[in-house]
Amino acid sequence: MPDFFETELRVGEIVKAEIFRKAKKPAYKLWINFGKSLGIKTSSAQITSLYTTQMLVGKMVIAVTNLEPRQVGPFISEVLVLGVDGKRDGDIILITPEDEANIGNRVH
């Protein structure tokens, strides 16, 4: 695991979202476009209480992009999408750029 100052956060756009039926807890499989330098990366996210798959496609997100890939059941999660706890227990709210940001841009 890289140290804090080596953590790479980038803006991505969710281009595909599916229900992760084989996950132990309710989750989605996400495909996120990070532009030319990184391309499309995958992630598993337990965000089903506030989002549908239709709501997620086209959504801009912030993700950690330089972690080792992680096996989540039969799925490989390549990036970690960031979120914050919601008002209700178990709710996760995705962190998104306030204005349109360019896909692949680093977060400073």
Where do the model's predicted regions map?
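Phosphate-backbone binding interfaces of nucleic-acid-interacting proteins
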Residues: M1-H108
